[in-house]
Amino acid sequence: MSFLTTPKMLSEYQCLKNIGFSHKTVLKRRLFRKECTPALKSFYSTQDPALNEVRTEKLKNGVTYVCDPRPGHFSGLGVYVKAGSRYETKKFSGVSHFMDRLAFQATERTPVGEMKAKLENLGGNYMCSTSRESMIYQAAVFNDDVKSMSKLLAETVLAPKIQEDDLVHYRDSIIYENSELWTKPDALLGEFAHVTAFQNNTLGNCLLCTPDKVNGITATSIREYLKYFYRPEHLTLAYAGIPQEIAKEITKELYGHLPSSSLPPLEAIPSHYTGGFMGIKKSEAPPVPYQQEFTHVVIAMEGLPVTDPDIYALACLQFLLGGGGSFSAGGPGKGMYSRLYLNVLNQYPWVETCMAFNHSYTDSGLFGMFVTILDDAAHLAAPLIIRELCNTVLSVTSEETERAKNQLKSSLLMNLESRMISLEDLGRQIQTQNGLYITPKEMIEKIDALTPSDLSRVARRVLTGNVSNPGNGTGKPTVLIHGNVDEVGDVFALCKKAGIGH
């Protein structure tokens, strides 16, 4: 057994691998870690269970922070900003995409070289991503480096250095990213499904900065974006594995000085589900490095927001349908007994991919299926999807319900074993649910309570267009076709005949 994996170190080594630490970093930190302060040493100690409860507090200026103090070998830090593509007006369209390019680069106080050196010396894992409803900044570090990483995180969120010279490089990378999207059908379908389902509003705003808008993004527009969205009341901080008193101290030190914003609150525009059709013929798509021989079809309906009581039933329904690619290594927990594997992928060799999806947001959602099918069989894609969707209303057995519940629970709990994922769950719950945090135990109890009739009921509610969300959606199907558009046929007529949508 190597030095890195002696029994004494095994648990820490495994944990570090899970969040992306390298072998060199583990060894370096083991041999050369500086002595921890008494407060930071307590991260590893067993504490009173009452001290391990998740707590939330709001500063006077509006900054909210939440802390899960349960100790571990490393700690998680996150900043979640109420920003993203759904909040973009015409003036700020595409700016969110530039924000993740600016993360962990030069700041007003730290040159880019020094920033990179500090991050490398910390040896942690850090990231920034843009979603439709949030800008996410996260890091996982050793416990004795929490304060150092917190300062770098605050710098990159509050004071990124924005220079026109740097934007030239970011524009090129964003244009390249847009071109790459056309070579990844899964990502392409997900993005265009939102654009079609919520046309010209909120969740339908493109997550990427489109090529026609790239050159219009300037240093001035980014600074205005920062001023408008990065206000104290829009910031939610999350801490995992950090004692409450240290989390409070860090928050007040780094964010307590921010003045309350004098700007008016963001206009609360509800997400209006429109449904609709988008067809992309091969001749209309940009050229790709290979000849596309598949047609991709999506059929979706308005889903449920994260606060809807039926959200667990709909998530379970997604696992019941399941699906995936035509090739799978198999094995326990792979979903090989889900309906889409049994009824579609294992039956029809001309189906490359068939999968159910479920996206939930603060006030709406998107639920449906997509299939990737050989061009010669394109006319069979829509009937396949509609058949499987309708069967969830007609019949759901106890056996497949229990299987789907177990898969949902295992997926939830295994994901939460990751420090970064549990951190995001903590921060995003507080941000999207007005400070409410639902524990994993409570989620499991809600999943356990589901019955086959619950799944059929929520399937009927969604597929018939009877979802009542704040945006008063149309209840019409969303249909997206990429490939042999004409061969797929009249999908709306098939949906109407099957009773899907209004």
Curated annotation (Swiss-Prot):
Q: Which Gene3D superfamilies match?
A: Metalloenzyme, LuxS/M16 peptidase-like
Against Pfam families, the record matches this protein to: Peptidase_M16, Peptidase_M16_C
Q: What is this protein called?
A: Probable mitochondrial-processing peptidase subunit alpha
Per the record, its GO cellular-component terms are:
mitochondrial processing peptidase complex; mitochondrion
What's the superkingdom here?
A: Eukaryota
Where found, per UniProt? Mitochondrion matrix
Give the matching PANTHER family. Answer: METALLOPROTEASE, MITOCHONDRIAL-PROCESSING PEPTIDASE SUBUNIT ALPHA
Q: What does this protein do?
A: Substrate recognition and binding subunit of the essential mitochondrial processing protease (MPP), which cleaves the mitochondrial sequence off newly imported precursors proteins.
Q: Which family does it belong to?
A: Belongs to the peptidase M16 family.
